[in-house]
Amino acid sequence: RDLVRSRGLGDVYKRQIYYKSETTLPFKADLYPENGFLKGGSTDNVAMEYGLKFHIDWLKGQKTGFFVDQRENRSLLERYAKGRSVLNMFCYTGGFSVYAMRGDAKLVHSVDSSAKAIDLTNKNIELNFPGDTRHAAYAEDAFKYLDRMGDQYDLIVLDPPAFAKHRDALRNALQGYRKLNVKAFEKIKPGGILFTFSCSQAVSKENFLSLIHISEPTRPY
């Protein structure tokens, strides 16, 4: 917080700066996490990313309220979406869904266990594509949704929350990622595409790639 002020970032970011550390800083005795506006104060926020608009909840949203680190992957997905049926699991703000819609996907299904996330996704779809009927959203557990869905998709996005925030949870996390990806592969049509991610710090790139290869089915493509 003091660093933000001392570097004069208030002059760089013209509209507002929201400092959020209560749920993001690791616990240490000498740290005092707190949230609050350093500049501005509006909670009605719409951000623009590559020409698309997104409602963002800085205050109550997960972490920063919008995962900017995925913007290039969202843009990449848009290039593969044309004419495809797309399933966006753990959709949160619906970022991948919005890009798939602009990429002319045949249909887009968004799934998240949080009703608030589904509401936010629907708002972002309507903000960019008012009245478009290609999109449907479901507030449901990801594993249960994959179990009950008989249809297969051309493209699936898996962007779950962290399964392991520390090394002690690594084994269970790897099992969870493998189970999730196995189920996703079962719902992908032959020749389909899987966008799969891990934000678990304890899971290395090598661990993740290995479990993806193990999860991949042996059916011919």
Set out the residue ranges of the language-model regions.
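Conserved SAM-binding motif I beta-strand of class I
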Residues: 107-112
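Conserved SAM-binding loop of SAM-dependent methyltransferases across substrates and taxa
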Residues: 93-105
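C-terminal substrate-binding/active-site "lid" region of AdoMet-derived donor-dependent transferases
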Residues: 179-215, 219
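Mobile active-site "lid"/loop adjacent to the S-adenosyl-L-methionine
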Residues: 153-183
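S-adenosyl-L-methionine
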Residues: 119-151
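Conserved class I S-adenosyl-L-methionine
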Residues: 83-89
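Single conserved hydrophobic/aromatic residue that forms the stacking wall/gate
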Residues: 2-13, 213-221
